[in-house]
Amino acid sequence: MGTWDTSLYGGDLPLDIKDEYYEQLYEGHTPEEAAALVWKELRLGEEDLPVFRLILADVQWKLGQMTEDTLRNALEVLDNGAAMAEWEGASESDRRSRQRVLDRLRKKLESPQGPLKTVKRPKPKKFKYKIGDVISVQLVPELVKGKPEIEIYCNKYFMVQA
């Protein structure tokens, strides 16, 4: 698992939690069931609890589903310093940036959430090619500058079958 920026969803774990939560809602589970299943499916541990509580609160708030327990748990993480614990070794500017993110999250969570939103599984995008279609792709020099092992194939066409 990695973290690439200070945003609330700037890491693998927050995105996994959000995606799995939506997946459980798509399957027809209640918000409470979905939260429990996320914890189980992702095999989360105590060290993941602060991130889990913050992401769960954010997603539920956006969907109009946030319960008092979810809010209380998220505010506890924000109040007791657990939300910043994983940022102890980060640079001062990253810690300040993350704290601003958490401050905005607190403000949002303490504001009234919107109406309950219906969550539907997105329809898959239609692929414009049919199975068996052949696609021709030209390798252009701009994409392979400085890679001599690939430059020899520039301006040639590759055929791909769908």
Which positions does each model-derived feature cover?
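Amphipathic alpha-helical elements of HEAT/ARM-like alpha-solenoid repeat scaffolds that form extended
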Residues: G2, D16-I17, D48-K62, R95-D103
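Charged interaction/catalytic cores of defense and host-pathogen modules
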Residues: A36-E92
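Short coil-to-beta transition motif at edge beta-strands of beta-rich domains
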Residues: K125-K145
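Short terminal alpha-helical segments
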Residues: M1-W39
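Mixed-charge, Lys/Arg-rich low-complexity intrinsically disordered regions
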Residues: S93-I131
